[in-house]
Amino acid sequence: MIIADTGFWLALFDRRDNHHQAVRAFFVTLKEPFITTLPVLTEVCYLLQTRCYPLKATDFLMAQQAGLFHLFTISEDHLLKMSQLMIEYADLPMDLADASLVLLAEELGHGRIVSTDRRDFHTYRWKNSEPLSNLLEGVL
């Protein structure tokens, strides 16, 4: 499964996004399923509602229901690790959505991600030392 960040979803669903064409072209070539987290889902819905129009967020939610991506469940046990990550990367700063994706990489055992946020995801490490591999690196 490919981990998907907020920027990827925004570029895919918002035709006015600067990365829409590149992300859309990349998206149609992929055969692997996507996975994301509830903090990312929340962030995407909020931004689609404010950047596009209120019902655009429902398109995103319906896409999940149609099987476009899986949703990783964050438990209470994960909150300590996410807060530790946010402290470690406070200088960027790391938000809850990003912390949830680094945690997801640790849970999946790989750091393959799609994100338009190249700076932060180039800096973050899963398992404290493993770099994330942004599959959009050569596309954007």
Question: Which residues are covered by each model-predicted region?
Answer:
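Active-site neighborhoods of divalent-metal-dependent phosphate/nucleic-acid chemistry enzymes
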Residues: 71-116
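Short, conserved active-site loops that position catalytic residues or coordinate cofactors/metal ions
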Residues: 37-43
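Acidic active-site catalytic centers that drive phospho-/nucleotidyl reactions
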Residues: 5, 43, 98, 117
